[in-house]
Amino acid sequence: MDKLADLNYTLSVVTLMNDTLHSIIQDPGMAYFPYVASVLTVLFALHKASIPTMKMALKTSKCSYKVIKYCIVPIINTLFKLAGFQEPITTKDEIEQPMDGIVKEIRRPLEMIDKLTTPEIEQVELLKSLHDHLITRPVDVIDMSKEFNQKNIKTLDEWDSGKNPYEPSEVTASM
């Protein structure tokens, strides 16, 4: 860890790598040299930064999946960017975060629609029950078995004189 934080050590290793590359490749006009040097520099920096970070992460989290998820994925993304790939590797959390936001945005109007339509649905049900109660039923359907005074009802044929005694007759009054 001490050597990781030591800037002079890191710069001396980078200088050593550059000197080694210059000694291997004698042609100073080589077109790919800056790219090779930058890749080697990035690989060295990743090596020096990632190994102690992963060791600390493994000790603290006690879960190798999280270490891979949060340490290895950015390293692989960096290497892919150096190789020229545009699309980075994403973790599941990075994908689920926007999806959760989308689901929340969809759920909010649905809840509002539910709040607005509940009273209307109740009103429609009330109107339906009122309509059912107010419908006039045909006479044939009326159930007369529940009438309590059916025994006292007589038809015109059943009266003794054949005349209804309850019909008003002509009344003459004196003046």
From Swiss-Prot:
**Ranges in the topological domain labelled Lumenal:** 1-28
Q: Which GO terms describe its biological process?
A: monoatomic ion transmembrane transport; symbiont-mediated activation of host autophagy; viral process
Q: Which Gene3D superfamilies match?
A: 1.20.5.430
Q: Would the keyword Transferase be found if you checked this record's keyword annotation?
A: no
In its record, the post-translational modification comment is: The N-glycosyl content is primarily Man(9)GlcNAc, with a small amount of Man(8)GlcNAc.
The residues on the Cytoplasmic side of the membrane are 52-175
Matches recorded under SUPFAM superfamilies: Rotavirus nonstructural proteins
Q: Does Glycoprotein show up as a keyword for this record?
A: yes
User: Where is the protein localized?
Assistant: Host rough endoplasmic reticulum membrane; Host membrane, Host caveola; Secreted
Q: Which Pfam families match?
A: Rota_NSP4
Which first-to-last residue range defines the signal peptide?
Answer: none
Which sequence ranges are marked TM in the entry? 29-51
What membrane topology term does the record carry?
Single-pass type III membrane protein
Which keywords are on file for this protein? Answer: Activation of host autophagy by virus, Calcium, Enterotoxin, Glycoprotein, Host endoplasmic reticulum, Host membrane, Host-virus interaction, Ion channel, Ion transport, Membrane, Metal-binding, Secreted, Signal-anchor, Toxin, Transmembrane, Transmembrane helix, Transport, Viral ion channel, Virulence
Q: How does it assemble?
A: Homotetramer. Interacts with the immature particle in the viroplasm. Interacts with host CAV1, early and late in infection. Interacts with host integrin ITGA1/ITGB1 heterodimer. Interacts with host integrin ITGA2/ITGB1 heterodimer. Interaction with microtubules blocks trafficking to the Golgi apparatus.
Q: What is known of its domains?
A: Binds 1 calcium ion per tetramer.
This chain's protein is named Non-structural glycoprotein 4
Source organism per UniProt = Rotavirus A (strain RVA/Human/Japan/MO/1982/G3P1A[8])
